[in-house]
């Protein structure tokens, strides 16, 4: 029995020795089964976006102009004699065929003609194909073009719709002309300036009249609007601007407006009483802001940037068409502006004040290529003392203005540089030789932030009080973003589209 037990134990030991370590299962193990790997899921294909269908017809009040670059083209032409609404319809754009009038001129007294209202919804695009295509809103009629911060209204050129416009394109269609019954100084008849029958023909047309005696006249609202690639010369000295305001009254609302690559001025104001706020003027080939014919008003928050050394003239031109003692006298008040002049081919001034104009500038930044400030005037008309009996406010006024140009003040016989310097230095916190520290072309840096601001609200209730100079306080101040368009020479951020695209 002991012998048999020993034999069995020896067999068991030999069996264990014959087994490799890999053949020994852990306690409780059975058959080892290697699981089949989970198959990689087939990715869901990204759906192809459904193209916006092109509308098959056009709204009432327009005619079908066919298809242009995948858009239905709905044409405005002739005279709009009754109220018209241009709706935002996906896949549809509107166009101007020739001069398009809103209403018929009602005259300075508002007793003639026929008024009409053109309303444009946010996101609408309206284009012109040539310099003969432009929009005129006549006295007594109104334009309500109210876009939004994320969906601006765009007035532009056919080439922009077709995708062929570039950052050097300009003068590809006429522009927008807004007329009213507010006072002007220069009449086309032997009439006293500012009278109800004092009227004139606006530049770029032969018979579009403006002027009257209604200071608070209301020509409508332009808000969150772009006007691209406009401007057209009918004849030398007779041009359409990006936006032309003739005799427009203070009841008109004008804010958040960009003028891009106008072949003439960005905005020209012929008399009247309009107030403007939040303006962006990019690439104007003449003056950025031109004011004439007894304009009285307030303008705040302006960014104006020229394209390059070969395009543009002054950032401001203010005068009165040679009639320097005509009344009402121009009295423009400008606050919180940043001007970037780059042109070296036209004019010699960044700011030109002449023709007996009265002008007040506060909280401004001026960067130029030649003379920062030129004040002209026959017989000292632009620098004469205040005289309420003659509607004269006195010499130009400057507070919290900083300038950086090769020459601060232009030296000429009518107003020598020393006299201009005395006027400039009579204000507070001015610096004619400051060093710019702007970022992204127009945003204040350390040197700009160090300047003590002037309380602009003391000049009029339209002005907001700010604690900074310039148009843009810092990188967190983004009033310009989203509703503007970008170019290679200036960017307003990723929320703004490129000007060359819709």
How would you describe each model-predicted region?
Residues 1-8:
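Bacterial N-terminal signal peptides that target proteins for export
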Residues 9-13:
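Hydrophobic helical h-region of N-terminal Sec-dependent signal peptides
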Residues 15-18:
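C-terminal motif of bacterial Sec signal peptides marking the signal peptidase cleavage site
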Residues 20-23:
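Bacterial signal peptide processing site
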Residues 26-32, 51-117, 129-140, 147, ...:
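Extracellular beta-rich repeat passengers
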Residues 34-56:
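Ser/Thr-rich, Proline-interspersed low-complexity disordered segments
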Residues 151-152:
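Glycine-rich loop(s) and the adjacent beta-strand/alpha-helix scaffold that form part
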């Amino acid at each position: 029995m002991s012998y048999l037990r020993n034999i069995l134990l020896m067999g068991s030991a030999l069996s264990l020795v014959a087994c490799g370590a890999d053949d020994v299962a852990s306690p409780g193990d059975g058959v080892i089964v290697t699981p089949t790997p989970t198959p990689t899921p087939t990715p869901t294909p990204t759906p192809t976006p459904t193209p916006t269908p092109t509308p098959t017809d056009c709204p009432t009040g327009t005619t079908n102009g066919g298809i242009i670059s995948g858009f239905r083209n709905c044409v405005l032409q002739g005279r709009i004699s009754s109220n018209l609404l241009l709706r935002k319809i996906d896949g549809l754009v509107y166009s101007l065929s020739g001069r398009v009038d809103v209403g018929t001129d009602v005259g300075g007294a508002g007793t003639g003609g026929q008024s009409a209202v053109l309303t444009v919804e946010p996101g609408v695009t309206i284009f012109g194909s040539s310099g003969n295509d432009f929009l005129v809103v006549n006295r007594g009629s109104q334009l309500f073009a109210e876009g939004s911060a994320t969906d601006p209204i765009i007035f532009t050129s056919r080439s922009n719709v077709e995708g062929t416009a570039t950052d050097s394109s300009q003068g590809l269609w006429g522009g927008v002309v807004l007329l009213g019954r507010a006072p002007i100084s220069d009449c086309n008849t032997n009439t006293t300036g500012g009278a109800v029958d004092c009227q004139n023909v606006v530049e770029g047309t032969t018979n579009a009249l403006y002027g009257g005696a209604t200071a608070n006249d209301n020509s409508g609202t332009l808000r969150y609007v772009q006007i691209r690639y406009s401007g057209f010369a009918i004849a030398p000295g007779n041009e359409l601007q990006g936006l032309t305001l003739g005799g427009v009254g203070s009841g008109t609302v004008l804010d958040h407006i960009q003028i891009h690559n106008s072949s003439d001025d960005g905005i020209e104001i012929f008399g009247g009483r309009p107030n403007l706020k939040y303006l962006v003027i990019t690439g104007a080939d003449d003056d950025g802001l031109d004011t004439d014919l007894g304009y009285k008003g307030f303008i705040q928050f302006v960014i104006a940037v020229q394209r390059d050394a070969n395009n543009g003239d002054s950032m401001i031109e203010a005068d009165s068409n040679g009639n320097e003692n005509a009344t009402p006298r121009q009295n423009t008040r400008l606050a919180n502006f940043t001007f970037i002049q780059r042109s070296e081919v036209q004019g010699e001034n960044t700011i030109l004040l002449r023709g007996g104009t009265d002008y007040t500038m506060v909280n401004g930044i001026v960067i130029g290529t030649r003379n920062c400030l030129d004040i002209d005037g026959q017989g000292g008309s632009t620098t004469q003392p205040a005289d309420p009996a003659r509607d004269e406010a006195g010499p130009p006024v400057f507070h919290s203005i900083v300038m950086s140009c090769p020459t601060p003040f232009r030296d000429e016989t009518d107003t020598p540089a020393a006299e201009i310097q005395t006027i400039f230095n009579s204000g507070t916190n001015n610096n004619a030789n400051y060093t710019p520290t702007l970022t992204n072309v127009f945003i204040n840096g350390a040197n700009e932030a160090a300047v003590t601001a002037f309380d602009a609200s003391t000049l009029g209730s339209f002005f907001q009080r700010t604690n900074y100079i310039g148009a843009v306080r810092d990188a967190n101040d983004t009033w310009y973003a989203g509703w503007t368009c970008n170019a290679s020479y200036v960017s307003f951020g990723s929320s703004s589209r490129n000007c060359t695209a819709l």
